[in-house]
Regions:
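Single conserved hydrophobic/aromatic residue that forms the stacking wall/gate
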Residues: 1-11
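C-terminal amphipathic alpha-helical interaction region
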Residues: 14-134
Length: 134
């Protein structure tokens, strides 16, 4: 059984342990995912602290937290796709080139949204909870 204290670290370690692509072409993708895993880890620590001390802040951030978690998980899945794509590339170049291009789009256009979600969420809940409707 994993305590809630270490859950984010367990996931981060699992993802990093599974990233064992040796192809040099994968390095930019791995670097991107590691960077965003670190943001997820900071966000997880922030959420754990806010759940204890400021539940409204945690509530206000939960949607963004789930987005970040989902994007990191999708990046992890794309790395697995890339591992196969680089290995099998010569057997079906057109097919695997499409996979690599789609991964490139995801890692450069979609995954960076994590930063925005993290920054937005960690500003606190005042902008949500204290909004005055007219």
């Amino acid at each position: 059984q994993v305590s809630s204290r270490g859950l984010g670290d367990v996931y981060k370690r699992q993802v990093k342990d599974e990233i064992n692509i040796t192809d040099k072409k994968a390095e930019p993708f791995i670097k991107q995912l590691n960077y965003h895993l670190d943001i997820l880890s900071k966000f997880t620590d922030w959420m754990k602290e806010k759940i204890k001390n400021s539940p409204e802040d945690a509530s206000g951030a939960c949607n963004d937290y789930l987005k970040v978690l989902g994007l990191v998980a999708t990046g992890h899945a794309w790395l697995k796709v890339l591992e196969v794509s680089f290995k099998e590339y010569d057997s079906n170049k057109d097919f695997y080139e499409d996979k690599i291009q789609t991964a490139n789009f995801f890692f450069n256009r979609v995954l960076p949204r994590i930063e925005s979600s993290y920054i937005t969420a960690t500003t606190g809940s005042n902008y949500i909870m204290n909004y005055k409707f007219n």
